[in-house]
A protein has these predicted regions:
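Intrinsically disordered, compositionally biased repeat/linker segments
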Residues: 1-36
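Extracellular carbohydrate-recognition regions
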Residues: 31-58
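A short beta-strand element within beta-rich, extracytoplasmic domains
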Residues: 90-105
């Protein structure tokens, strides 16, 4: 939620400075009325990349502000995950993406975005889609209006982006592309 003070709107991505100190939260009495968002990505490093399928069919492209995880399903299965972090969600209850696009054009394919550990074990799945036998047809972009509640007591997480494209010999993909992840 934005803070409006003297007709000036301060977004959660902005700064509130009081007596020369940058505040992370503003309270009115005992009620918190503004909290600065915490950036997970860009910022969180790639802690682990796991290629779980046919090596050449899994790619990760990361320029520091945009990350793309892609699995190609050809004669073999493309499957892998990138793990970003660690980061602490202590004091935050929700997560959102400024732009995360998940799309699948292949059958027997999946995309998954989860909170978990460095080994790729997920604690909470945020986004998951499995095409089963149908030929793709999944293309969704999640933005700042799509809030995900963090529902685990654990506060130390990694963000896991996982793609799996079936061995269908069709040469089609399962892809996740993200350019911002924030805690509020």
């Amino acid at each position: 939620m934005a803070l409006v003070f003297n007709n000036v709107t301060v977004p959660q991505s902005g700064n509130v400075i009081y007596n020369g100190t940058s505040l992370s939260a503003v309270k009115m009495g005992a009620t918190e009325v503004w909290k600065r968002q915490k950036t997970v990505y860009p910022g969180a490093p790639v802690a682990n990349t796991q290629n779980l399928g046919y090596g050449p069919y899994f790619t990760v492209t990361n320029n520091g502000s945009d990350i793309k995880v892609d699995a190609f399903g050809g004669t073999e299965r493309g499957w892998g995950r990138v793990i970003l972090g660690p980061f602490s969600s202590a004091g935050y209850s929700k997560l959102y993406f400024s732009a995360l696009r998940a799309y699948i054009t292949n059958a027997f394919s999946k995309v998954s975005v989860s909170l978990g550990d460095i080994n790729g074990n997920w604690v909470q799945r945020l986004i998951y889609h499995d095409t089963g036998e149908s030929l793709g047809g999944y293309d969704v972009t999640f933005g700042s209006g799509d809030l995900f509640t963090i529902n685990s007591a654990n506060s130390n997480y990694y963000l896991i982006l996982e793609v799996d494209s079936g061995a269908t010999a069709r040469g089609l993909n399962a892809t996740i592309q993200m350019n911002g992840c924030y805690l509020i």
